[in-house]
Design a protein with these regions (language model features):
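Conserved catalytic or regulatory cores that recognize and/or transform ribose-phosphate-containing ligands
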Residues: 1-186
């Protein structure tokens, strides 16, 4: 491999370009919105934004893009999820265990996870970096298809486990840094 020295102006230009990409790349965060779980996703989004990933988003961040007459409900939720996925280049999935009186927490995020995988399999979305964070213990009680998809990991996505949401902040930021470097060749 040949080595080429960068001139000072070129270094400054590359740094400026890096920050431009970092501030403008769309990062999707998927997970449950039930109870405190939505606050956790918002906290992760805000953490990434504080580190310069200004377009880290959850689906509700796209609400202003829909027709104002769109009624709240499952159709709106699906449209928002589709917008989030279709416009994002980096994807973060957060799978959590159900606590008492919580049900079907991973149903929607599992469908989003499968949708991205299918879009990639059919060449509709190019290779998309994704990180999958799983609350410890979920892997023991989840259904067989979920366990199989995680074990199979056909796209080579990052997989990590956590006890509380704060434990994924730094790994998610590092994942975004690696993904940005891969996408833009930095």
């Amino acid at each position: 491999m040949s080595h080429r020295d960068l001139v000072p102006d070129e270094i400054a230009d590359r740094v400026q370009l890096y920050w431009y990409f970092k501030e403008n790349i769309n990062i999707a965060i998927y997970g449950s919105f039930q109870q405190s779980r939505k606050r956790d996703l918002l906290a992760l989004r805000d953490y990434l934004r504080a580190y310069g990933y200004l377009n880290a988003r959850i689906s509700e961040d796209y609400s202003d893009r829909l027709d104002p007459g769109t009624e709240d409900g499952p159709i709106k939720d699906t449209r928002l999820s589709d917008l989030l996925m279709d416009e994002s280049s980096i994807h973060i999935f957060v799978f959590v265990k159900e606590h008492q009186d919580e049900h079907y927490l991973i149903q929607s995020v599992s469908m989003e996870f499968q949708r991205l995988s299918t879009l990639m399999q059919h060449g509709i979305k190019e290779d998309q970096p994704a990180a999958i964070y799983i609350e410890e213990g979920l892997e023991k009680i989840a259904g067989g298809v979920f366990k199989g998809r995680i074990a199979q990991n056909e796209h080579g996505w990052d997989i990590g486990f956590f006890k509380n949401i704060e434990q994924i902040y730094k790994p998610a930021r590092r994942f975004c840094e690696r993904s940005l470097a891969r996408i833009y060749g930095f």
